[in-house]
Amino acid sequence: RQTRSCMCGLSQGSHSQSKEEKQTVNNLSAGDVRDSMPLFRSGCGGLSPTSALHLSINRCKVQRACKLNEVWHSRFPKIHWSNVVRNRDYVCFLAEYDDIAYASAIWSSPVAANRLKEGKTALELRRMAISDDAPKNTASRMIGIMRKIIKKEFPHITLLLSYQDTDVHEGTIYKASGWYPASKNKGTSWTNNSRQRNKEQSLSDKIRWEFRLRDSPIK
């Protein structure tokens, strides 16, 4: 399927998976990975949602979120689950209707946390990918609900951030969700003389959008 996606691009011990569960996710087809009950329906749900209000926003296993991102994200499909769980904080969400996923989101501690003043108390939307059959306004509704969940359940997080790929996006989703543009960063490679990284999926300029949850962590 052609899909809509954006650049975005919490440590949950209860979300750990066994080796068998991880292998099951890896072996699912693109259709099955959308379905919360693939063994019963093989990816065939009921009616499609006609409004974003019909979607329920739920946490999900990181492996499933990464698999859906691979299927849906047109710009940044590659993100391995091990690069998510090694962070101090991370959490993943799905937007579902009738147990079928229509969007996925992956949050973690910022990739450039050491360069940010609030790096230790910030959370970055690393990836957000939306299927082309998702209803209008899915992204803004999902971002709004995820923001409320994170603020309520993770009192040490003070700031949310995400990077917009300027080559393909105009930041409309962030503007509609009440975020503000904090800075514009020139696209650069993470590879340097001392460390070789995988080839970048994009080297375009990025705008960092932010949303403040609170002024200081709640202890």
Region roles according to the model:
Residues 35-83:
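Short amphipathic alpha-helix that is part of the acyltransferase structural core
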Residues 90, 204-208:
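Short hydrophobic/aromatic beta-strand or adjacent loop that forms the aromatic wall/cage
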Residues 56-59, 104, 108-205:
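Acyl-donor binding region in acyl/amide transferases
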Residues 27-35:
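A positional "C-terminalness" feature that preferentially activates on distal terminal regions of long
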Residues 89-105:
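Conserved beta-hairpin
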Residues 216-219:
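Flexible, glycine-/basic-rich loop-and-beta segments that form/coincide
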Residues 16-19:
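Short, charge-rich patches within N-terminal targeting peptides
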Residues 3-13:
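Cysteine-rich micro-motifs
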